[in-house]
From Swiss-Prot:
[4Fe-4S] cluster 1 binds at residues 37, 42, 48, 281. Its EC number is 2.8.1.8. This is Lipoyl synthase. It comes from Halorubrum lacusprofundi (strain ATCC 49239 / DSM 5036 / JCM 8891 / ACAM 34). It catalyses: [[Fe-S] cluster scaffold protein carrying a second [4Fe-4S](2+) cluster] + N(6)-octanoyl-L-lysyl-[protein] + 2 oxidized [2Fe-2S]-[ferredoxin] + 2 S-adenosyl-L-methionine + 4 H(+) = [[Fe-S] cluster scaffold protein] + N(6)-[(R)-dihydrolipoyl]-L-lysyl-[protein] + 4 Fe(3+) + 2 hydrogen sulfide + 2 5'-deoxyadenosine + 2 L-methionine + 2 reduced [2Fe-2S]-[ferredoxin]. Its cofactor is [4Fe-4S] cluster. Belongs to the radical SAM superfamily. Lipoyl synthase family. InterPro entries: Aldolase_TIM, Elp3/MiaA/NifB-like_rSAM, LIAS_N, Lipoyl_synth, rSAM. GO terms for molecular function: 4 iron, 4 sulfur cluster binding; lipoate synthase activity; metal ion binding. It is found in: Cytoplasm. GO terms for cellular component: cytoplasm.
Length: 312
């Protein structure tokens, strides 16, 4: 393990700044909205919010800033959940419209304390955004809803453009990386149901550097391919604090490029965003989906567009 070791140069990033970044942050504070970008201390926050190649993207975190689960990689606090804010769906939709986003990502904390896992609240937020502007592309990064098919179907029925659910790591490392209530097969089942019950694009993400072996990553890609996942992302795990899971290793950028090639060429995923600083909602994946859906490009053209704009 690499406790105490300096981060390599390729993991250094500039603090977020710029007028666009400041504007978005102020709008979010005015409406008391949360973003996973801030809660998870995402290293790409400034780049995505500032919209270097467009109007910018923010990932809104629904249903509060405290989670019913305690994953050892995640910086979101556990316990002490509050009642849902019934105004949140409208507030998020208004903020999206005011900021001028073309592509918005919605995610949430886990709310195992709620009968439906918060799925109706999630779905209503999607619908409110679509009411404001049907042209806005909506990606949802959903929890597993404890495997409840009705909860998953509520998200499908709301009609987002992408449904993502993260397996996070290989099967062997689900614990200690994820909360014990998370399960590899259950996560695959969520993705499989979306693929079987709809034509909505599916997406998932894996962290590298938590102790996985290459053959386990390869097998995971195979499992994801079998359930019809369209887009996969790889990023470096970074320890949020010393009380979180240790970083096992800092994976070289060349390794990320290798996994990108394997995902796209061997397993035929539509797109793979892969790099040390890539996160699940990293804009390269969003640029790909936007090019594919909005502009009707072929997967090959959409890949080139996303890499050129995303700097991959």
């Amino acid at each position: 393990m690499q406790r105490g070791r300096r981060k390599p140069d390729w993991l250094k990033s500039r603090p977020p700044s710029g007028s666009r970044f400041t504007e978005i942050k102020e709008r979010l504070r005015e409406r008391d909205l949360h973003t996973v970008c801030e809660e998870a201390n995402c290293p790409n926050m400034g780049e995505c919010w500032s919209g270097r190649d467009g109007p910018g993207t923010a990932t809104f975190m629904l249903m509060g800033d405290r989670c019913s689960r305690g994953c050892n990689f995640c910086d979101v606090e556990t316990g002490g959940m509050k009642s849902l804010d019934s105004d949140e769906p409208e507030n998020v939709a208004d903020a999206v419209a005011e900021i001028g986003l073309d592509y918005v990502v919605l995610t949430s904390v886990d709310r195992d304390d709620l009968a439906d896992g918060g799925s109706e609240h999630f779905a209503e937020t999607i619908r409110e955004i679509q009411r404001r502007d049907p042209e806005i592309l909506v990606e949802t990064l959903i929890p597993d809803f404890q495997g409840d098919p009705e909860a998953i179907d509520r998200i499908i029925d709301a009609g987002p453009d992408v449904i993502a659910h993260n397996v996070e790591t290989v099967e062997r490392l689900q614990w200690p990386v994820r909360d014990r209530r998370a399960d590899y097969e259950q996560s695959l089942a969520v993705l499989d149901r979306v693929g079987r019950e709809s034509d909505i694009h599916t997406k998932t993400s894996l962290m590298l550097g938590v102790g996985e072996y290459d053959h386990e990553v390869y097998r995971t890609l195979g499992d994801l391919s079998e359930v019809g996942v369209d887009v996969v992302t790889f990023g470096q795990y970074l320890q949020p604090s010393r009380s979180h899971l240790d970083v096992f290793e800092y994976v070289h950028p060349d390794v990320f490029e290798t996994w990108r090639a394997v995902a796209e060429r061997e397993f035929d995923f539509l797109y793979c965003a892969s790099g040390p600083m890539v996160r699940s909602s990293y804009k390269a994946g969003e640029l790909f989906v936007e090019a594919l859906l909005r502009e009707g490009r072929s997967p090959e053209d959409a890949r080139r567009h996303a890499r050129a704009a995303g700097g991959d």
